[in-house]
Design a protein with these regions (language model features):
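N-terminal signal peptide c-region/cleavage motif recognized by signal peptidases
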Residues: 13-18
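A short beta-strand-turn-helix
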Residues: 19-41
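Structural microenvironment flanking redox-active thiols in thiol-disulfide oxidoreductases
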Residues: 55-97, 108-113
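Short pre-active-site segment immediately N-terminal to redox-active cysteine/selenocysteine motifs
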Residues: 39-41, 46-49, 85
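Bacterial N-terminal signal peptides that target proteins for export
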Residues: 1-8
Length: 164
């Protein structure tokens, strides 16, 4: 029975690491897997047609640039995941450049993929702060996020990493 519970947990997490992400810059396969590293990961899921997504991205980019200079004893990484076609993402990023990597979701069911990240509704924008190697910390933020919300969630995740 224990073996099946472990397998079920592994399968439940599988969509998170499936080959449905590519790096927008070079179209190579990408992953949100942080491995055993004690890192805090901020993942912002967005689309070019989503007005709140477009509005929050400049602030997210500025927050990340400042966050990279902070020293919390734990590395903070950020990625944006676009639910769009490459040409649409290119056009958007030309007008609103960001300072963090942009990935694209290429799978067939973005709603199920977002559910696997903790988004119960599939609504955008959606941000998740994760620290899988630090007690599997996860905080989900639905809707437009503020730099203050991100800082609070990252500080909580970093504290858990330092404690563990």
């Amino acid at each position: 029975m224990k073996k099946y519970v472990g397998l079920a947990a592994l399968l439940a997490a599988a969509p998170l690491y499936a080959a449905d992400l590519v790096n927008h810059a070079d179209n190579r396969p990408a992953s949100l897997d942080t491995g055993a590293q004690k890192r805090v990961q901020v993942v912002n899921v967005w689309a070019t047609w989503c007005v709140p997504c477009r509005r929050e991205m400049p602030a997210l980019s500025q927050w990340y640039a400042a966050e990279k200079r902070q020293r919390r004893g734990v590395r903070v990484e950020m990625a944006g995941v676009a639910l769009d076609k490459p040409a649409d993402v290119n056009r958007f990023l030309q007008s609103v450049p960001v300072r963090y990597p942009i990935l694209r979701y290429t799978g067939n069911d973005s709603t199920a993929w977002m559910h696997s990240l903790g988004n119960p509704t599939g609504a955008l924008p959606f941000t998740v702060i994760r620290a899988p190697a630090c007690g599997n910390y996860r905080k989900t933020l639905l809707g437009e996020v503020s730099p203050q919300q991100l800082t609070q969630a990252v500080e909580a995740a970093a504290a858990q990493c330092r404690a563990g």
